[in-house]
């Protein structure tokens, strides 16, 4: 997911984040709870085992029993939605070797970024690229094998595997840099809704959540679709569209207060929150007391999905003593409704199918 921060920053242990969460007044009926177990959401597919955002990663996640797969969506120059964590693809493909002259600098969400960008390539050009593993300490055995998938290919995979397995598999797309793409004439939401509608996925009963770190696009989606929406909330910073409207909060901290959650509930069905906002970890890697965020969100009528659990030693907090399953159990015990993980096999084995 991030803007779900540069993955390598996460090598430094996530620290104290949830200070702004406060108890909410008992005021909202019909709060959701984790009925049986949290849903297992395969973060970028089974990205702990295969290069992220590839059909191989999504298919493996489905085979492992994930309830949802998560494609991050960006646009090509010819308005086709494809799955990449960022529109800058230098770190996840072999683009530098194949198109060295396309390297450039763009301003994305107010900051300069240098690299290769999906919006500078047609789909046909992107088809010539192959995915590579982002993180140096994970296996690179599958580098150079998988192309960049389109949204339609991902949805076709989900429909086909649901039919073959008799299991309802969900899709949890994130619109990346929505305001930026709209500003350059490549909006993400319209082709996403059209692709979902072609599969008959237009209501809350559909196996779909649409997520975003921005606010305005989700608010605009609410009257246009019945599918469930999830507001992403980071531990720090602000939405990229902050300041564009009185309806967009100035910071993520404001959004996770009881009043902020109540406002989110007017347009969204869930919040996707950085895990430290639910169960903080101190600078020594020790667990602190859980925050009130899960209870606050449930009072507002919102489901709570946390991100991102990773089994790698570089990411797993010391508090779990190398036991990745213990982290899944800890969040399940706190009543969260869904968990994003790079290793969905660990989540399914720990929580059950």
Language-model features, listed with the residues they occupy:
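Phosphate-group recognition and catalysis centered on beta-loop-alpha active-site segments
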Residues: 2, 9, 18-353
């Amino acid at each position: 997911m991030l803007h779900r921060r540069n993955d390598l920053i996460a090598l430094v242990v996530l620290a104290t984040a949830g200070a702004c969460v406060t108890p909410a007044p008992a005021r909202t009926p019909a709060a959701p709870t984790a009925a049986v177990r949290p849903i297992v959401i395969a973060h970028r597919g089974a990205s702990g085992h295969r290069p992220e955002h590839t059909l191989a990663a999504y298919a493996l996640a489905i085979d492992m029993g994930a309830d949802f797969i998560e494609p991050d969506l960006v646009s090509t120059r010819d308005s086709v939605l494809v799955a990449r964590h960022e529109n800058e693809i230098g770190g996840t493909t072999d683009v530098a070797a194949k198109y060295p002259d396309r390297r450039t600098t763009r301003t994305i969400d107010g900051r300069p970024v240098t690299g290769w960008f999906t919006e500078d390539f047609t789909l046909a050009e992107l088809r010539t690229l192959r995915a590579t593993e982002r993180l140096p300490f994970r296996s690179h055995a599958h580098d150079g094998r998988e192309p960049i998938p389109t949204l339609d290919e991902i949805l076709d995979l989900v429909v086909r595997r649901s039919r073959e397995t008799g299991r309802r598999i969900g899709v949890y797309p994130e619109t990346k840099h929505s305001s930026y793409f709209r500003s350059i004439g490549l909006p993400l939401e319209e082709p996403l809704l059209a692709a979902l509608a072609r599969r008959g996925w237009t209501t809350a009963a559909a196996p779909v959540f649409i997520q975003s770190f921005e606010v305005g696009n989700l608010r605009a989606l609410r009257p246009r679709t019945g599918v469930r929406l999830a507001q992403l909330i980071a531990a720090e910073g602000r939405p990229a569209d902050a300041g564009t409207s009185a309806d967009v909060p100035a910071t993520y901290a404001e959004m996770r207060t009881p009043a902020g959650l109540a406002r989110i509930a007017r347009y969204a069905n869930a919040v996707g929150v950085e895990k430290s906002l639910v169960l903080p970890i101190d600078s020594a890697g020790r667990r602190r007391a859980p925050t009130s965020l899960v209870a606050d969100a449930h009072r507002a009528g919102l489901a709570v999905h946390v991100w991102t659990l990773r089994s790698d030693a570089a990411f797993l907090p010391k508090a779990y003593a190398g036991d990745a399953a213990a982290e899944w159990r800890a969040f399940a015990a706190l009543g969260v409704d869904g968990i994003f993980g790079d290793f969905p096999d660990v989540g399914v084995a720990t929580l059950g199918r």
